[in-house]
């Protein structure tokens, strides 16, 4: 069974965006290619258990095992050596991506305290959107009483659109709650 948002994309969003931007083919309609989640933990070199907990929690959130990210260079001021594990990341594609986006928009973001919407300033000019959350506990898969450290998660939504406006419309059609909805 296909993910709910994938079905919505094919049946509702593609015709809507094709009509709005007047593409000559439906293959020109922007689509979500992947979502990359990244956790950077500065304390990982002094507390390896915190990184292991972050890996397990990110696996719970996404349904996919993250890969540990390693330092590219040694930095003496931060007591970091080349090859040290400093964080973890996961790349979501296909049904995992659509399921995660569905949970993020409909469950996790509304659980953020004093949530007014996500910023529109996260677009990079090439149709990709970056955002971050301050605490991982907004996801229902995370049990608050088993948390040792709070950390933020950076998310990058990669689309094949050519402009920010197309990517904005695509994510808004998926239900992304922007602060000043256009």
From Swiss-Prot:
Coiled coil: none annotated. It holds the Pfam family Ribosomal_L5_C. One of its GO terms (biological process) is translation. InterPro entries: Ribosomal_uL5 (IPR002132), Ribosomal_uL5_bac-type (IPR020930), Ribosomal_uL5_C (IPR031309), Ribosomal_uL5_CS (IPR020929), Ribosomal_uL5_dom_sf (IPR022803), Ribosomal_uL5_N (IPR031310). Gene3D superfamilies: 3.30.1440.10. Transmembrane segments: none annotated. GO terms for molecular function: RNA binding; rRNA binding; structural constituent of ribosome; tRNA binding. GO terms for cellular component: cytosolic large ribosomal subunit. Keywords: Ribonucleoprotein, Ribosomal protein, RNA-binding, rRNA-binding, tRNA-binding. Part of the 50S ribosomal subunit; part of the 5S rRNA/L5/L18/L25 subcomplex. Contacts the 5S rRNA and the P site tRNA. Forms a bridge to the 30S subunit in the 70S ribosome. This is one of the proteins that bind and probably mediate the attachment of the 5S RNA into the large ribosomal subunit, where it forms part of the central protuberance. In the 70S ribosome it contacts protein S13 of the 30S subunit (bridge B1b), connecting the 2 subunits; this bridge is implicated in subunit movement. Contacts the P site tRNA; the 5S rRNA and some of its associated proteins might help stabilize positioning of ribosome-bound tRNAs. HAMAP family: Ribosomal_uL5_B (MF_01333_B). Belongs to the universal ribosomal protein uL5 family. This is Large ribosomal subunit protein uL5. It comes from Leptospira interrogans serogroup Icterohaemorrhagiae serovar Lai (strain 56601). The lineage of its organism: Bacteria, Pseudomonadati, Spirochaetota, Spirochaetia, Leptospirales.
